[in-house]
Amino acid sequence: MIENNMTTNQINSLNRRVQDLKRYLDYNKKKSRVLEIDLELSSPKTWTEQISIKKLNKEKYLLNSIIQNINEIEENIKEVVIFLELAIETQDNLVFKESLLEIQKIEQEIKKLEFYRMFSKKNDHYDCYIDIQSGSGGTDAQDWSKMLLRMYLRWADKKGFHTEIIDESIGEIVGIKSSTIKVSGEYAFGWFRTETGIHRLIRKSPFDSGKRRHTSFSSIFIYPDINEKIDININYSDLRIDVYRASGAGGQHVNRTESAVRITHLPTNIVTQCQNNRSQHKNKEQAMKQMQSKLYEIQMRKKQEEKQKIEQNKSDITWGNQIRSYILDNSKIKDLRTGVEKNHVQSVLDGDLDDFIEQSLIMGL
């Protein structure tokens, strides 16, 4: 005989969690904000500013994504209640089992939305940049930086993000000296921001004829791509702008013209580079945009006292500021902040970062 006590408790629990979701995700405020955005988009004044249109449409998309997900969950709960009542009334085991499976699916959807609580920081909804900088360790470190680049590109692809390599400096023998990736997608900065720090690799070096153990370091810095006017003062006399020949893809063109641009902020020694456009003007515009976003993120980190000064992070890519160790010989990867440890090394290097990143977000790092 089919009993309804257990399923009633499950349904009540799901309904409570949905109401909690509505409260801490500001469901009603989000619905009101969508109406406000529609009014703004209908204004002729807005249509003279392309950046504003893009920003408003993206905000509306993110808001509607959450609103629609909550609405669908509520509808699915109502439907499963109807099927449960039918199953109990007719004592139909098949319908009852299908209803239990549907309850499990609804619970998974609720869990996904509950995770959005982690994206509570001001800039979490923006796209982001990933700076990879090779540290101490010579050829091994440059090879390690290339491995990290591949790992992040794989993870971003699994999450449905769009990626673009903005700049890349090829290593002397193998790997890369540095690289900048742009990641676009829903809450890209929120997902990636806790990866900022030093990543340490320990392995038997393939570049050492004696196959001795080597330790290599690579620095990762994540900052948001803020598509609006940033309230940060940059004195242009503090900038040094260099142009050079691009070293990446682009055929013969990149060898004939100095289209790549490097901008250095002299007071902090922070550098941004771009070489993925054929136009020097576009590369300069992109590099300046990165510089503004980068300086803004550093300013925010200093205010919040979440990280040490960026100058220390950039100048001492060795033992300090480590967040994760990758010990290949022992098949162990350990996050030094969260304690998360995995033994499937190749899986992680192939982009299986969910456990590390999700735990860091849950802990509020």
UniProtKB/Swiss-Prot annotation:
Keyword vocabulary terms for this entry: Cytoplasm, Methylation, Protein biosynthesis
SMART domains in the cross-refs: PCRF
Record flagged with keyword Protein biosynthesis: yes
InterPro entries: PCRF (IPR005139), Pep_chain_release_fac_I (IPR000352), Pep_chain_release_fac_I_sf (IPR045853), PrfB (IPR004374)
UniProt-listed GO biological process terms: viral translational frameshifting
Modification sites for N5-methylglutamine: Q252
Domain of life, per lineage: Bacteria
Gene Ontology molecular functions: translation release factor activity, codon specific
Gene3D superfamilies on file: 3.30.160.20, 3.30.70.1660, Release factor
GO CC term (a single one): cytoplasm
Pfam families: PCRF, RF-1
Location(s) in or outside the cell: Cytoplasm
Protein family: Belongs to the prokaryotic/mitochondrial release factor family.
UniProt protein name: Peptide chain release factor 2
Lineage of source species: Bacteria, Pseudomonadati, Pseudomonadota, Gammaproteobacteria, Enterobacterales
